[in-house]
Amino acid sequence: YYKNRPEGYDQLLSSGRVVIKDDVHIGALCTIDKGVTGDTTIDVGTKLDNQVQIAHDTVIGKKCLLASQVAVAGCVIIEDEVILWGQVGIKSDITIHKGVEVDAQSGVGFDLEEGKKYFGSPCIEARQKMRELSMMRILPDIVQKLRK
């Protein structure tokens, strides 16, 4: 949204719009930036909880659910039926494919494959992350046994 120049940051001129289709719910204190080079679009049936940030030129598909405090950077494509739980952060210029679910407080920095569930920061497939977390719980016991 800003160009870094030697004399400081220069705000880019916006020529886009915000397009909100039918049956979209936008909760309290949401921020939706208009597009810089194209439109920011929220498609039919999508629901935004309170305090959601949608940056410029982002396209959100049909029947998506974004829980409270989700932040989406610019130029992101979120395909249909995606669920982003609370406080998920999404890096710019990526695609979240159809049917993806991202658990709360996850950080998304790359494209996510269709129909999978993700968790963590950086996020990975949720089952793998849960395995890692369960192994971390027993790690102190393993280290103690190795020291004996």
Map each language-model feature to its residues.
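Structural signal for interior beta-strand "rungs" in well-ordered beta-sheet cores
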Residues: Y1-E125
